Amino acid sequence: MADESGDAAGCPPPAPAPIRRQSSANYRAYATEPHAKKKSKISASRKLQLKTLMLQIAKQELEREAEERRGEKGRALSTRCQPLELAGLGFAELQDLCRQLHARVDKVDEERYDVEAKVTKNITEIADLTQKIFDLRGKFKRPTLRRVRISADAMMQALLGTRAKESLDLRAHLKQVKKEDTEKENREVGDWRKNIDALSGMEGRKKKFEG
């Protein structure tokens, strides 16, 4: 009994188990355990019904806009193209009326041509301004480049034009040496061994002293 009490008194008590937070335990349980996905509040049949209703409304709006355009076109034609009164007109009067109608048609064609020219000009200006904006922003579309085989002479000709031949003539800036001058120098130098023999010995020293 004494030994057991001594061993119990000498050994330290066991450390308590770490206490885990309730929030972390709940998070682990939620992450590990499978859970059902949240169901949508609207069923599939209800979604299909709403889509069908939206398509029907859009179709009705398009039909109404087309009917309004047809009505506007009819009103414009009725105001501009009045009905002809041909009752009681003679042959000469009918000819005059035809001439007036042809003149009016020609005038309308001229106006239509002018309007088309203005529209084309405006479209071109808009395209140019849009391209300038893209160039300033640095977002221009690069064209596709094709690989072309070209020689160095043709490339220099394309870049420099008439100056290509002048720039390629590299010997034009070099110093030209005449053949007669080189032969004269060779004659003056002569054989170098004879010069060494002439300057060696007492005679050579005498020549150096006298020179």
Curated annotation (Swiss-Prot):
<feature type="modified residue" description="Phosphoserine; by PKA and PKD/PRKD1">
    <location>
        <position position="24"/>
    </location>
</feature>
<dbReference type="InterPro" id="IPR001978">
    <property type="entry name" value="Troponin"/>
</dbReference>
<feature type="modified residue" description="Phosphothreonine">
    <location>
        <position position="182"/>
    </location>
</feature>
<dbReference type="Pfam" id="PF11636">
    <property type="entry name" value="Troponin-I_N"/>
</dbReference>
<dbReference type="GO" id="GO:0003009">
    <property type="term" value="P:skeletal muscle contraction"/>
</dbReference>
<feature type="modified residue" description="Phosphothreonine">
    <location>
        <position position="79"/>
    </location>
</feature>
<feature type="modified residue" description="Phosphothreonine; by STK4/MST1">
    <location>
        <position position="130"/>
    </location>
</feature>
<dbReference type="GO" id="GO:0005861">
    <property type="term" value="C:troponin complex"/>
</dbReference>
<dbReference type="InterPro" id="IPR021666">
    <property type="entry name" value="Troponin-I_N"/>
</dbReference>
<feature type="modified residue" description="Phosphothreonine; by STK4/MST1">
    <location>
        <position position="32"/>
    </location>
</feature>
<feature type="region of interest" description="Involved in binding TNC">
    <location>
        <begin position="33"/>
        <end position="80"/>
    </location>
</feature>
<keyword id="KW-0514">Muscle protein</keyword>
<feature type="modified residue" description="Phosphoserine">
    <location>
        <position position="78"/>
    </location>
</feature>
<feature type="modified residue" description="Phosphoserine">
    <location>
        <position position="200"/>
    </location>
</feature>
<feature type="modified residue" description="Phosphoserine">
    <location>
        <position position="5"/>
    </location>
</feature>
<feature type="modified residue" description="Phosphoserine; by PKC/PRKCE">
    <location>
        <position position="43"/>
    </location>
</feature>
<feature type="modified residue" description="N-acetylalanine">
    <location>
        <position position="2"/>
    </location>
</feature>
<comment type="similarity">
    <text>Belongs to the troponin I family.</text>
</comment>
<dbReference type="GO" id="GO:0003779">
    <property type="term" value="F:actin binding"/>
</dbReference>
<protein>
    <recommendedName>
        <fullName>Troponin I, cardiac muscle</fullName>
    </recommendedName>
</protein>
<feature type="modified residue" description="Phosphoserine; by PAK3">
    <location>
        <position position="151"/>
    </location>
</feature>
<dbReference type="GO" id="GO:0060048">
    <property type="term" value="P:cardiac muscle contraction"/>
</dbReference>
<dbReference type="Pfam" id="PF00992">
    <property type="entry name" value="Troponin"/>
</dbReference>
<feature type="region of interest" description="Involved in binding TNC and actin">
    <location>
        <begin position="130"/>
        <end position="150"/>
    </location>
</feature>
<feature type="site" description="Involved in TNI-TNT interactions">
    <location>
        <position position="98"/>
    </location>
</feature>
<feature type="modified residue" description="Phosphothreonine; by STK4/MST1">
    <location>
        <position position="144"/>
    </location>
</feature>
<comment type="subunit">
    <text>Binds to actin and tropomyosin. Interacts with TRIM63. Interacts with STK4/MST1.</text>
</comment>
<keyword id="KW-0007">Acetylation</keyword>
<dbReference type="InterPro" id="IPR038077">
    <property type="entry name" value="Troponin_sf"/>
</dbReference>
<comment type="function">
    <text>Troponin I is the inhibitory subunit of troponin, the thin filament regulatory complex which confers calcium-sensitivity to striated muscle actomyosin ATPase activity.</text>
</comment>
<feature type="modified residue" description="Phosphotyrosine">
    <location>
        <position position="27"/>
    </location>
</feature>
<keyword id="KW-0009">Actin-binding</keyword>
<feature type="modified residue" description="Phosphoserine">
    <location>
        <position position="167"/>
    </location>
</feature>
<feature type="modified residue" description="Phosphoserine; by PKA and PKD/PRKD1">
    <location>
        <position position="23"/>
    </location>
</feature>
<feature type="modified residue" description="Phosphothreonine; by STK4/MST1">
    <location>
        <position position="52"/>
    </location>
</feature>
<feature type="modified residue" description="Phosphoserine; by PKC/PRKCE">
    <location>
        <position position="45"/>
    </location>
</feature>
<dbReference type="InterPro" id="IPR050875">
    <property type="entry name" value="Troponin_I"/>
</dbReference>
<feature type="region of interest" description="Disordered">
    <location>
        <begin position="1"/>
        <end position="23"/>
    </location>
</feature>
<feature type="site" description="Involved in TNI-TNT interactions">
    <location>
        <position position="81"/>
    </location>
</feature>
<keyword id="KW-0597">Phosphoprotein</keyword>
